[in-house]
């Protein structure tokens, strides 16, 4: 195999992940309304794919057209491959929505009504709705020398309206643009009595098509064509020109809405001359045009399951388990002082993490609280608890990562509120995203200071903690808590990195540790000792780690990798990676935990980490890897995080040498193993 073929294309691998997500929308074992949600997730993922990865490829093609990255292809070649794969995925997605999901939903009396199928009473209600809810809000923009083509917001819904006639001022007009504000719903529910007692929805685009003429009185509407522009959403801040990072990011957030276009979506009924006109306005080519058979934004269909009261068509609710030791009246610090606590979300409640900060805020023995925030959502109980602690005159330090992609606005808002409450807010280290998930509480106990720390694989986000699978460790281990304190001092202050006792950190020691542990397993295999690596992560694309894994495989190390998303390593290639197996698990929960286990001659060195095996995590972010050494906790991490995932034959996909995936299935006589359901049964309490 040539050097160029040893590494797969990361963008194609990311699209392959979205094909696995789309398979959930096809799976008849998944409740029907949840299948619709998975369809929407794919659309949301594709939006981000174009905003970030395709935008990066376009910039790379412009700046370095001859450069060949790890996969050996020039940017233009990769763009062509990725465009073809994206078109195939999008066609499949719309075919699934139009020809499978809509008919199945209709059989459950959940209808998406097209204009041609509206009844008389539905037409009357829709017209009244337009007059009452839409007409006062919409502002048409006629195109003439005094009204140039407007700049549509990123991913906004717009309409190109063809007109015939003259307006009140005698101006002839051939074209106007109507922008649909984001506050408007993209699907409008009809009253049940108009839908035979079931649920009915109409698309905003259909309502506008039917009544757009009311925006142009006295003129003839010849055509109305929806379009949606996706823009480059990279957010860049020049370190040398920035005096106030928060203010600079606020400015960049506005500018991001108007980045360069990377994709134009139109309905497949849009005439060629309108397509060409729009492409010219946005300086795009036919290669960046996507014609879809249906509404140009399927993401907003995610509102439908919440509007339909059909529990039988949704996942049954789960209640996270709570550790028996964590009684309602048991102070968490008393428990952690006795032994560390391992939490596995969402199967076990995130509440102990919130309780830790809440108790710290109210505890007179607590002197200081420190915490990182990467993503925490708009409705956080943790941030108000930190504010309460600051208002109680405790020393509160919060490292807020303002550059967390697509959460920048939330984080700017929280940072402002924390500062107003008296917290010491730090925006990390310029040039390095603070992706580590860590919190530290310092108490005075019996006249001495005692530290308590939480370290996790996932964000301090109560919303995603109910969906994402993650591990968290709450510990009073003196060496680990001292390390966490050192990391906070590094981030908030200046000076050289401190020496850590147990933790590994990016960008200094984590990559070396991973490479070193792989090399040690390689040497063990060469010496005839048992050698094994098992790891779970979201993405694996860092080339030096991949090459180290190839060397380990060649030496006989048995390697099992559970990689949910991107993986550019080729498994199962004779002479290269025949001892490497890669699987991806896609189910109801989003697999998000990062767990590494190196056999080490039977010692099973085990870590939970905030870092995937990507270049950005190793070299451009501040990350942590925490060793799990307590025997019972290590046993749990290995079993729940790795062994049960390797046994899954229900939601697992097995990666092939060419980068494709096939679905795992029980062998003849083998019982079904479902990682996520089995973990709910094990941990819900």
Swiss-Prot record:
One of its GO terms (molecular function) is polyphosphate kinase activity. Its EC number is 2.7.4.1. Mg(2+) binds at residues 375, 405. This is Polyphosphate kinase. SUPFAM superfamilies: Phospholipase D/nuclease (SSF56024), PHP14-like (SSF143724), PPK N-terminal domain-like (SSF140356). It comes from Neisseria gonorrhoeae (strain ATCC 700825 / FA 1090). GO terms for cellular component: polyphosphate kinase complex. PANTHER family: POLYPHOSPHATE KINASE (PTHR30218:SF0). The active site is at 435 (phosphohistidine intermediate). Coiled coil: none annotated. It catalyses: [phosphate](n) + ATP = [phosphate](n+1) + ADP. ATP binds at residues 45, 468, 564, 592. Its cofactor is Mg(2+). Catalyzes the reversible transfer of the terminal phosphate of ATP to form a long-chain polyphosphate (polyP). Disulfide bonds: none annotated. An intermediate of this reaction is the autophosphorylated ppk in which a phosphate is covalently linked to a histidine residue through a N-P bond.
